[in-house]
Amino acid sequence: MIVNALSKAIMAETLCDELKLNKPVAKEMVENFFEELRHALENGQHVKLSGFGNFTLRDKPQRPGRNPKTGEEIPVEARRVVTFKPGLKLKTKIEKIGK
């Protein structure tokens, strides 16, 4: 179980409180934000959020793998993955929290 996780519902509620929006509008804003991120990544674009970080696409080549139960060698197919690299501001704030 994840404790203290930020959900889309919590984000929408924060928008309601901070910007005095009604709940359906806030939920739609949050959904639209994530839909834009998904759309950009699906179209091969990188997503750069200033002060937060970058989402980039990386192509991973096929590689040999192993079935942990049988030890049988099986190929792991080539695939595209999304990676996230935190921006300097976010990194700095997270490092300060850890101290």
Curated annotation (Swiss-Prot):
MF-aspect GO terms: DNA binding; structural constituent of chromatin
Single Gene Ontology BP annotation: regulation of DNA-templated transcription
Any one cellular-component term (Gene Ontology): cytosol
Superkingdom to which the source organism belongs: Bacteria
Region described as Disordered: spans on this chain: 52-73
Repeat as UniProt keyword: no
Keywords: DNA recombination, DNA-binding, Transcription, Transcription regulation, Translation regulation
Family as reported in the entry's similarity comment: Belongs to the bacterial histone-like protein family.
Protein role: This protein is one of the two subunits of integration host factor, a specific DNA-binding protein that functions in genetic recombination as well as in transcriptional and translational control.
Subunit annotation: Heterodimer of an alpha and a beta chain.
Name of this protein: Integration host factor subunit alpha
Organism of origin: Legionella pneumophila subsp. pneumophila (strain Philadelphia 1 / ATCC 33152 / DSM 7513)
